[in-house]
Each structure stands twice: as C-alpha cells, then as structure tokens.
Amino acid sequence: MKLKTLVKVLAVGLVLVGTHVPSTPREATPPPPQPHINLDVCGAPSLPVARVKARALITQIRADLAAVEEEIRHVPFLSAVEAGTVPVAQIAAVAAEEYSIIRSDMQSFTSMAQRWDTPNGSHFFSDLAAGEALALPLLLTFGAHVGLDEQALAAYEPRPKAQTYPSRVAGIAANADRASAAASFLVNFGVFGENMARLRAALSGVYGFAPEAIAFFTFFAEPIPGFEEDALEVIAVGLLEGACPRDVRRSARLLQAYELDFWQAAADPPGSPLPVIGPPMP
C-alpha cells in the first residue's frame, strides 16, 4: 500500500511539475509574402494578385492626377456661383450641357454592359447606365424650375469643350478594356460629386432653390455605396484578362482632363440662348 501510495504521489508531482515547466516559445508564423507588383507589366497571373495590383494602380493614378483634381475643384465658375454672381441662364446652361451628356453616357454605359457584364456576375456597367436613366427626369425637373422644358434642352447648342467628356466615354465603350473603363470612372466620379455638392449647396443657400428642384445635383453629389470595391473588382478582372497598366493610366488621365474641360467651359457664354426664368427667392 505504501509503495503504491508513493508511486501515486510521484506521478502527481511529475504532472504538476510538467504543467509549470515553461514550454519552449514557438516562433511566430510569418505572414505570407506579398507578391511583387510591377505596374509596368501587362496582366496578372491570378485573381488575388490582380486585386492587389488593381489597388496599387489606383493609388498610383490618384497620386498622378492630384494636381488636375485640384484644378477641377478650384475652377472660377464654382466660386462665382457660391458668391451668387452667376446669372441663372449660365447655371441653366450647365443643365443643358448635362442633357446631352447624360443621353450619350447612358448609351455608352449600355454598350459597356453588353461587352463586359454577365448575367450571374458583374453588373457594374449596367448599374451606371441605370443611374443615368434615373438622373434624366431629375434634370428635367430642374429645367422646369428655370423655365426650360425638354424641347428647349434638346434645342440648346452644346459648347464643344463641355462635350469632350462624353466623347471620351463613348470612346471607352467602343475601344477600351474593362480595367481602363472602371478605373477611369472610379478616379473621376469623386471630384465630380464634390463639385455637384457645391453647386447644390449654392443653388439652395444662395439662389433659393427648393430641395426637390435641385435633386439632380443631389443625385450626383452623393457617393454610390460600394462603388469603389465594385470598380476595383472589375479592374482586377481586366488585369487578369491581360489589361496593361499603361492603358489604364492613360484612360483615367484623359477622362479627368475632359472633366476639367467641362467645368472650365461652364464659365463661358452658353452655346445658344436659353429662355430661363429665375428661381423663387426665399
């Protein structure tokens, strides 16, 4: 009995000692190595690498175009509208230009959707086309508040410099790859939305338009939920298909330059006379 008891005591002691002996520290598992991303090489070997490359490419493009974005933000037209010194007819000319732009972009986005969207996959471009379709009646509402019906908007003669943007979008629809298309709009929509938000604020606070009258500007001022992630995925798929970063950068640079064209043209005289009326002042 004593021997058995002693054996039990020794066994328990060994167990207790074992539980208090510090174990040899394990080396932390290093994170998997990040793939080397060369932004001068076309394509990507896999979708995960393409996703990393898409983000890196957009970061690079945004840095490259930062100066142009600042020009877009600081065009004299916006400051003048905020100061209340721009005639309503000239502001209405922006809407008249947008009438041509929206109708053109709607067709271009529809063409892109036919090229790149899939029934059970991406609907990125069809969503953009649907957005233009929603914006058009809002634009007509603004036109009605300044005395312009759709016939008057259609009769307006656009300024060439204000229409370089939709011409480029049509070119993207016909000739670009999906990565170049998605990157161009991802980089562009942010600053366009900022300027539309400033117009909305000035039209409300300075010119006295009611919220329902300027819903068109509100529509484009608000960011699209999930837009960046959706665009990055389309860019990644395009890179996986062999798209070249050089082409993606070029497309984004051109579209942003044409965005600047639009806002600079807004300060020029309207392309043709517009029979506008002023807003009801508070």
Predicted regions: what they are:
Residues 1-7:
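Bacterial N-terminal signal peptides that target proteins for export
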Residues 9-18:
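Bacterial N-terminal signal peptides
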Residues 20-30:
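Signal peptide processing junction and immediate N-terminal pro/mature segment
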Residues 33-77, 156-160, 225-230:
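Acidic, low-complexity proline/glycine-rich segments
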Residues 49, 60, 122-223:
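Active-site-proximal alpha-helical scaffolds that flank and shape metal-associated catalytic sites
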Residues 62-73, 81-115, 180-198, 258-263:
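Alpha-helical bundle segments that constitute or directly flank the non-heme di-iron/ferroxidase center
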Residues 166, 216-223, 240-256:
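C-terminal, helix-dominated tail/subdomain
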Residues 245-281:
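Acidic, carboxylate-rich catalytic segments that either coordinate divalent cations
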